[in-house]
Amino acid sequence: MAVYASNGITSVAASLARLMGFSPPHGADEPNLVLERYARAALGDRPVQRALLYHPDGIAHYLFARHTDVFLPVLQAAPLALPVQSVYPPVTPVCFASMYTGLPPEGHGICSYAKPILRVDTLFDAALRAGVRPAIVSTSGSTLSKIFLDRPMDYYILDSVDEVNARAEQLLREDEHDLLLVYNGNYDAAMHRYAPESPEALRALRVIPPPRACGRPRRAGRPQPLPRGSRPRRAGGSASAALLLPGAGRRRRGPRPRTAR
């Protein structure tokens, strides 16, 4: 079998946990040593205090090779770019489950295009044990809106990519979470409907929502706590820009996580 990258996506969970200073999920694959060494050279022994994981779905490596100009703004902003190898089958639920458990499909149990709630240990469980506050911001019906439910953390489930990006920027400004996952499915939807390199899909690949100020919301609009294991309701939002920025700073300890209404 050809090897396209020295690390697989199962390295993501342990890599992020190690960088943020907590123990990886039980049984997770080894971290990406290149990423870890780079971070240690940049940060020394200091852990990463804030992390944003941005997931634009369906963007395969061949798109990067054929349409590199689209990715130039990311390459100019990102200090390190690493290829990682997928699992099989390379469909969204299987991949996200492998990324955030650190396990192969047979280990976490999602082996096809299905979206059950994972019952094995995940990055989010490991983060919560360490007092790290995670949140997921995603469109309704997506893999990220389903397979990691039933944890005492925040879920912001919205109707559109613009709303997702607006809420993500708002959450970054509020700075009440340590680990934020953001999902955009606009390219994936266009690719499946038309074709991977159709004009419609390539337009979606290039779309960046216009920036807009997102002030701190009024307290009356803030989400209220729900009991452990409760399902999220949809949260409101408006169009804004997505941000891709790993943060640093002193970790604040706040109240128990909330689930958005």
What name fits each language-model region?
Residues 1-261:
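Feature captures the catalytic ectodomains and active-site-proximal regions of enzymes
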